[in-house]
Swiss-Prot record:
Pfam families: Ribosomal_L33
PANTHER family: 50S RIBOSOMAL PROTEIN L33, CHLOROPLASTIC, LARGE RIBOSOMAL SUBUNIT PROTEIN BL33C
Top-level lineage group: Bacteria
GO MF: structural constituent of ribosome
Gene that specifies this protein: rpmG1
Gene3D superfamilies from the UniProt entry: Ribosomal protein L33
InterPro entries assigned: Ribosomal_bL33 (IPR001705), Ribosomal_bL33_CS (IPR018264), Ribosomal_bL33_sf (IPR038584), Ribosomal_zn-bd (IPR011332)
Presence of keyword rRNA processing: no
GO cellular component entries: cytoplasm; ribonucleoprotein complex; ribosome
Keyword DNA-binding among UniProt keywords: no
Protein name: Large ribosomal subunit protein bL33A
GO biological process: translation
Family according to the record: Belongs to the bacterial ribosomal protein bL33 family.
Organism: Bacillus cytotoxicus (strain DSM 22905 / CIP 110041 / 391-98 / NVH 391-98)
Length: 49
């Protein structure tokens, strides 16, 4: 079962990315290092509800 998720920057709080994930394989919250436009650097982005 694939669901849409939103990734938010941990430093500024902006929701920069929308992605999909498989809940059966990845039950925990997703954390990825992505580029943040506001901070102009790569930061940790965490899955939000």
């Amino acid at each position: 079962m694939r669901v849409n998720i939103t990734l938010a920057c941990t430093e500024c709080g902006d929701r920069n990315y929308i992605s999909k994930k498989n809940k059966r394989n990845n039950a925990e919250r997703l954390e990825l290092k992505k580029y943040c436009k506001r901070d102009k650097k790569s930061t940790l982005h965490r899955e939000t509800k």
